[in-house]
Amino acid sequence: MKYPKEYLDEIKTRLKVSTVVSKSVSLKKRGKEFVGLSPFKTEKTPSFTVNDEKEFYHCFATSEHGNIFDFVMKTQNLKFGEAVKSLENLAG
């Protein structure tokens, strides 16, 4: 199913990337970003960053990056439509 850009933007407006990511990754605020251990790789030193202002995450250990939809698809093994529904429920 194709979703209108306005609808996806509304979900992104209601949910900060850090809010979505922090449900599965422990994040600490560092300046304008949040940092934490990568959900994509076992590590001891945090290499995973989240930037709410730019609406994306990036893992320096694996080069994974994207927005809230990408994160939910990758970490929960969902298709795009399923990720939208999951975030839709979270956004209320």
Where are these regions (language model features)?
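N-terminal structured subdomain of primase-like DNA metabolism proteins
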Residues: 1-92
